[in-house]
Amino acid sequence: MSWQNNLRSVSPYIAGEQAELTDMIKLNTNENPYPPSLQVQKVIEDFKSDNLRLYPSTDAKVLRKALATYHHLNTDQVFIGNGSDEVLSLSFLTFFNSEKPLLMPDISYSFYPIYCGLYHIPYQKIPLADDFSLSVNSYFQENGGIVIANPNAPTGMAISLQEIEEILQNNQDSIVLIDEAYIDFGGESCLPLLEKFDNLVVVQTFFKSRSLAGIRLGVAFGSAEAIAHLYDMKNSFNSYPIDSLAQKIGEASLNDETYFQKSVSKIITTRENFKKELIKLGFQVTDSKTNFVFVHHPKVDATTLFKALYEAKIIVRHWNQARISDWLRITIGTDREMNTVIQFLKEYLKNKEKSY
Amino acid sequence: MSWQNNLRSVSPYIAGEQAELTDMIKLNTNENPYPPSLQVQKVIEDFKSDNLRLYPSTDAKVLRKALATYHHLNTDQVFIGNGSDEVLSLSFLTFFNSEKPLLMPDISYSFYPIYCGLYHIPYQKIPLADDFSLSVNSYFQENGGIVIANPNAPTGMAISLQEIEEILQNNQDSIVLIDEAYIDFGGESCLPLLEKFDNLVVVQTFFKSRSLAGIRLGVAFGSAEAIAHLYDMKNSFNSYPIDSLAQKIGEASLNDETYFQKSVSKIITTRENFKKELIKLGFQVTDSKTNFVFVHHPKVDATTLFKALYEAKIIVRHWNQARISDWLRITIGTDREMNTVIQFLKEYLKNKEKSY
């Protein structure tokens, strides 16, 4: 016997590398290339540190209300957590306490099975089609819950509002969790379905489209009943998850709609141009509605290309995982960064041709 | 069947009321009456919001190293979490996965049994003596872990380094978690025992003695092995729990030792003076080594006094709980605030005498 016998064994998630090379082009963790709204800078400059001696609002009250107004929901339909990973984690713990399996696509955010391992939630991976498309019919079976990222990661592909509605209609006895971390880049949010379904929970984040990865703000929207259960869970885990400054920063970002729309549409334009160039170079590219693309070249081994890019100080993401080991995920940076990537790929492919 | 059947039921913690009265004297949640170090103000003013588009360091690398240096430990002996509540929560989940009961004092931080409920950890409350003192012998029995707040909350009473060593020596097959949230106000930290015991985990916080309740920084210290397990757990729950600004603020606070010592010693002086005055008024007062006092008046019902104080806009804390329902916990504020409390109590007791 030893204290080690009482440890709970887990298989932790491995986050994308935070490489620290100088002059690198960092396209591996889907960070936004543009700074947050100037309102954020202002709110930080104006912040009086005296306030920090006091506890923050336990439910980020002002921000919660602002988010409700923004999305035309009631305040009690909004939950705020310490980044969307925490929101997902607490949601899994709250809603998926069943002996029936949680259903999820076989290719999706790799944190989902880790939460399942942590909380002993049985789960079943539902294979996507060969083209990574999702068939809603495969979710019409007994389950203890459903989690789908829409748009999906790392494929970037989205499903329609109607498809989500079909899943909800056929699963009214389970929570259907739709992870909309990337929704602002072109997908269609299913928030309007909250009017019809009390078993829908939608998770979003401030980090990608609002350039606030550094501040950790994640959100869940749902029926007042579901959200109340999520708060009960949060209050069993940590009373004050969101610090005072983060709350203010979230409010400031939410108030600057013009900047938000502008920076999101810049990224979408860059993505579409980047996609066209990739296709010209012979890449296969999924129809991404996110701030990244998922790409494959029939003539190039993905691991080899990943390494070549890395040596050129262009950091992208690759998974040594069945079905996607031939693919790379590339975050959309600035036009300039993406042009550098295209120039590199042109050279790389040209040299490769020569060596045949 | 409905989705409600799959909910995990919990009994959430209820935090001290964040009353929003004007001109109130808020002495109910142990917040520090003094602002944080001026270095904190400076680091906020100098912070460039552009940095927020990037993820924070997953383990608050720089702050982690600074804390290790500060406490003469190795970096791998330091864990940083989103407030000490999160650190405690993850520690319970990591270390107390046994069928034998976790031992804790019957009167202690009321979040402990809530974590146990959440994670299905069996626990056994060990009664403190009538004077709220802790007998180490009662912890020499089979267990799946031990958690003791030192100084204890809400009694404020501390145990000695030697007593903790005895507990460790007799429980080498369990993690002994010492919660030192209030240690800076006069208790003796057991960090030096880390040299001898790999089953000791010590939790501290930035919020009380460093006036940073608003920023959410909690810390665990332990053997490199124990801390590695805690990080595995954290990485199964949330990759990036500490935002970039909080990391910088923590560093700034840690660097200003002079201010830290000064504000802590001011609070200790105020506490000792306040205690003397209370004793003069006939109160029974525990030997608190914290930034609060725990008091009882033989002639006054605690609930009645709590309400009278509340009406005078002096907010303190009371628990309707066996053994302590006759007691009030009063946070140490400024000298001026504590004088106001004493003046109120003098009047109150005088009027009470009259009404006999």
Swiss-Prot record, chains A, B:
The modification N6-(pyridoxal phosphate)lysine is found at residue 208. Pathway: Amino-acid biosynthesis; L-histidine biosynthesis; L-histidine from 5-phospho-alpha-D-ribose 1-diphosphate: step 7/9. Keywords: Amino-acid biosynthesis, Aminotransferase, Histidine biosynthesis, Pyridoxal phosphate, Transferase. Its cofactor is pyridoxal 5'-phosphate. SUPFAM superfamilies: PLP-dependent transferases (SSF53383). One of its GO terms (biological process) is L-histidine biosynthetic process. The keyword Cytoplasm does not apply. Pfam families: Aminotran_1_2. The keyword Amino-acid biosynthesis applies. It is an enzyme of class 2 (transferase). Its EC number is 2.6.1.9. It catalyses: L-histidinol phosphate + 2-oxoglutarate = 3-(imidazol-4-yl)-2-oxopropyl phosphate + L-glutamate. InterPro entries: Aminotransferase_I/II_large (IPR004839), HisP_aminotrans (IPR005861), HistidinolP_aminotransfase (IPR050106), PyrdxlP-dep_Trfase (IPR015424), PyrdxlP-dep_Trfase_major (IPR015421), PyrdxlP-dep_Trfase_small (IPR015422). It comes from the Bacteria. One of its GO terms (molecular function) is pyridoxal phosphate binding. Gene3D superfamilies: Aspartate Aminotransferase, domain 1, Type I PLP-dependent aspartate aminotransferase-like (Major domain). PANTHER family: HISTIDINOL-PHOSPHATE AMINOTRANSFERASE, HISTIDINOL-PHOSPHATE AMINOTRANSFERASE 2. Homodimer. Belongs to the class-II pyridoxal-phosphate-dependent aminotransferase family. Histidinol-phosphate aminotransferase subfamily. This is Histidinol-phosphate aminotransferase.
